[in-house]
Amino acid sequence: MFACSKFVSTPSLVKSTSQLLSRPLSAVVLKRPEILTDESLSSLAVSCPLTSLVSSRSFQTSAISRDIDTAAKFIGAGAATVGVAGSGAGIGTVFGSLIIGYARNPSLKQQLFSYAILGFALSEAMGLFCLMVAFLILFAM
């Protein structure tokens, strides 16, 4: 069975068939400037095979590809927004560590507070950066 399928589907046949079926034939036929009749369609089929028409197709976008692009935008923006939640967790960790450090050694209050403010600023900056990237993905692309 495997040997039979190996003879029936050669790599070149699979490649040409998949290229042929990837775009509708109407896009190729409409690209030609001459008016097509039944005789010209039959001469078109005889003179140049469909595999040669595949190479003459230009880039086109469809509604499906635009929907896929929109979905990819939303997925990317959602993934970038996850960083904002990480920023909130980082801020909570910074101030939790401040409270624990102050409870262990109250004499270092000023130094601990300055480090906590620095940690808060860095966490908040990363959160704002993630939010900015999410908005760039949504509205600038």
Swiss-Prot record:
Trimethylated by ATPSCKMT at Lys-109. Methylation is required for proper incorporation of the C subunit into the ATP synthase complex and mitochondrial respiration. Residues 1-66 form a transit peptide. Keywords: CF(0), Hydrogen ion transport, Ion transport, Lipid-binding, Membrane, Methylation, Mitochondrion, Transit peptide, Transmembrane, Transmembrane helix, Transport. It is a multi-pass membrane protein. GO terms for biological process: proton motive force-driven ATP synthesis. It holds the Pfam family ATP-synt_C. One of its GO terms (cellular component) is proton-transporting ATP synthase complex. The chain crosses the membrane at residues 82-102, 117-137. Belongs to the ATPase C chain family. F-type ATPases have 2 components, CF(1) - the catalytic core - and CF(0) - the membrane proton channel. CF(1) has five subunits: alpha(3), beta(3), gamma(1), delta(1), epsilon(1). CF(0) has three main subunits: a, b and c. Interacts with DNAJC30; interaction is direct. This is ATP synthase F(0) complex subunit C2, mitochondrial. It comes from Homo sapiens.
